[in-house]
A protein has these predicted regions:
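Charge-dense, extended regions
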Residues: 67-135
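Charged, helix-prone or intrinsically disordered regulatory segments positioned adjacent to compact structured domains
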Residues: 1-74
Length: 135
């Protein structure tokens, strides 16, 4: 069963679930929400902070990115908290490679790069993709 909110996805991660799976399932939930209001409800509640600063920053970036890309009208206030930003750069490649790090630095979306997270240009890409929201 998919998490209903980003906060639930983080709870699952803290309880040992795979970060990649929990976040991917959350993105599916978000994309399948029938309205913009329902989508916003999935990111409105602040996820608990974890012992992993990368996850804390990543979920802030995810919520901000989804709110802006799907034109929800506003971004949850919790995404701007200092704990949602990294002090040091994090390049999300699985291996150390200067060329990959350079690529990620220049391809990262603003919502991620502003938090010192450097990832591909479509980090939340899913096969299903976003569904048109009823207005």
């Amino acid at each position: 069963m998919r998490p209903n909110t980003l906060a639930e996805a983080v709870e699952r991660i803290q309880n040992g679930a795979s970060q990649d799976v929990a976040l991917a399932e959350f993105v599916d939930t978000f994309d399948l929400a029938p309205t913009s209001e329902a989508r916003y409800a999935t990111i409105e509640r602040e996820p608990a902070l974890t012992s992993d600063k990368r996850i804390d920053a990543l979920v802030g970036a995810i919520a901000e990115y989804l709110a802006k890309q799907r034109k929800l009208g506003h971004v949850p206030h919790w995404t701007s908290a200092a704990a949602r930003y990294l002090d040091r750069p994090w390049h999300t490649c699985a291996f150390e490679d200067d060329a990959m790090r350079e690529y990620l630095t220049f391809s990262s979306l603003a919502e991620f790069a502003s938090r010192n997270i450097f990832t591909e240009e479509r980090p939340l890409r899913r096969a299903r993709g976003p569904q048109p929201a009823n207005r």
